[in-house]
Amino acid sequence: MLIPKRVKFRRQHRPNRSGMSKGGNRVTFGDYGLQALEPTYITNRQIEAARIAINRHIKRGGKVWINIFPDRPLTQKPLGVRMGSGKGPVEKWVANVKPGRILFEMSYPDEQAAMEALRRAGAKLPCKVRIVKKEDQF
């Protein structure tokens, strides 16, 4: 699972999800990318499930880059606890994703297999995504 090794503060405010992604919105490393179309939080478990879905489909001969990292803690108080008495413990780690952000990149010689692998990974994520090619961006 992806979590930060060390953080300066255990609990943070919730991040802003409005607006478009300012950076990380072009395919730079691989040939194909998975681009978010909606603002959302993506947890470390969802990132791992999408990575496994890609790797199971392509097996060998390709390379996968994960462009997001869950560096924001989300807290939650236990069920049945009354209001007050401080902020709850960290429940999960999330990556704040804005529309236009490239989540995963991959390079693979077979285009159809690469598209299918990214489609399967997109099914594991909580937002609408689209598949983009490197040559179609510019």
UniProtKB/Swiss-Prot annotation:
InterPro entries: Ribosomal_uL16 (IPR047873), Ribosomal_uL16_bact-type (IPR000114), Ribosomal_uL16_CS (IPR020798), Ribosomal_uL16_dom (IPR016180), Ribosomal_uL16_sf (IPR036920). Part of the 50S ribosomal subunit. One of its GO terms (molecular function) is rRNA binding. This is Large ribosomal subunit protein uL16. One of its GO terms (cellular component) is cytosolic large ribosomal subunit. SUPFAM superfamilies: Ribosomal protein L16p/L10e. Keywords: Ribonucleoprotein, Ribosomal protein, RNA-binding, rRNA-binding, tRNA-binding. It comes from Corynebacterium urealyticum (strain ATCC 43042 / DSM 7109). Residues 1-25 are annotated as: Disordered. GO terms for biological process: translation. It holds the Pfam family Ribosomal_L16. Belongs to the universal ribosomal protein uL16 family. Residues 1-16 have a biased composition (Basic residues). NCBIfam families: rplP_bact (TIGR01164). Binds 23S rRNA and is also seen to make contacts with the A and possibly P site tRNAs.
